[in-house]
């Protein structure tokens, strides 16, 4: 078992290249480097790369199912239900270890509700970010969202304007040293559009759209052509690999960027993420 959803197919188009997993790391910013945030919280990069899925539960119309062979060999391709809930329990490899619960609820209208809970433990360092990472097989052509204008972070959104915006360029902000960018706070919905399914060189005539929408509270997201680890490993822009995938992170907590100076001043207290607390949020895929 991969420890997550292995496929999301909509109108014949595959939207997953890898199983969605909890994400705990963003690429360092200049301010993060200046305060040596990676020394204090670098264990979250390892937790982001390697996570242990300890349990999976499948509930169909209120009844617990046996999800492993040979018990699940009774199912055929025409099995249907009014509601299916798939629950994953993860443990981080941090010391001490934290627990993350991710629940997918699929209903007859085709929507997938995603509920995410992080249960912190005393002694863990501050988190850079907490959310779910979805890696798509090909590059998105664009995305549209309802939320705040431009790139926003918890401590960088006072001048943003609420509205509907479209972004056609998924490339990174061209900093001298590649770093985290492209976050959008307080988002009501997001539509990612592609003309490709599994191969960037094979474009279709029909535009395909995957929508993420809020359920209770607005969410934050970034939609980039690289993972945080790929950005982290590049010291100059030209060292980044060719862009081939779409990396969508739907976040429930985001650390601020600071910027008072870049040689020692930390992010202000209200914009930090205490990893000892509980973080919960939800969104829907449709």
Regions found by a protein language model. Give the residues of each.
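Beta-strand/loop-rich accessory regions of lumenal/periplasmic or secreted enzymes
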Residues: 1-286
């Amino acid at each position: 078992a991969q420890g997550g959803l292995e496929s999301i197919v909509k109108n014949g188009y595959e939207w997953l290249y890898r199983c969605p997993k909890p994400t705990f790391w963003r690429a360092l910013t200049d301010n993060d480097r200046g305060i040596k945030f990676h020394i204090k919280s670098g264990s979250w990069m390892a937790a982001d790369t390697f996570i242990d899925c300890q349990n999976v539960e499948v509930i169909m119309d209120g009844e617990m199912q046996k999800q492993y062979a040979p018990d699940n060999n009774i199912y055929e391709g025409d099995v249907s239900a009014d509601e299916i809930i798939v629950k994953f329990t993860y443990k981080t490899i941090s010391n001490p270890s934290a627990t993350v619960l991710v629940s997918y609820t699929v209903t007859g209208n085709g929507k997938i509700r995603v509920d995410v809970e992080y249960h912190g433990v005393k002694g863990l360092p501050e988190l850079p970010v907490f959310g779910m990472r979805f890696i798509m097989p090909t590059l998105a052509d664009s995305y549209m969202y309802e939320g705040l204008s431009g790139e926003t972070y918890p401590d960088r959104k006072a001048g943003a304007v609420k509205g509907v915006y479209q972004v056609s360029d998924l490339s990174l902000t061209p900093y001298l040293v590649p770093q985290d960018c492209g976050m959008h706070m307080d988002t009501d919905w997001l539509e990612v559009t592609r003309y490709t399914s599994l191969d960037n060189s094979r474009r279709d005539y029909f535009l395909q759209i995957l929508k993420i929408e809020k359920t209770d509270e607005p969410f934050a997201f970034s939609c980039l052509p690289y993972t945080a680890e790929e950005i982290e490993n590049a010291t100059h822009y030209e060292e980044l690999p060719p862009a081939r995938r779409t990396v969508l992170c739907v976040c429930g907590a985001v650390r601020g960027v600071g910027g008072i100076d870049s040689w020692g001043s930390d992010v202000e207290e209200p914009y930090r993420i205490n990893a000892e607390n509980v973080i919960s949020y939800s969104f829907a895929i449709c």
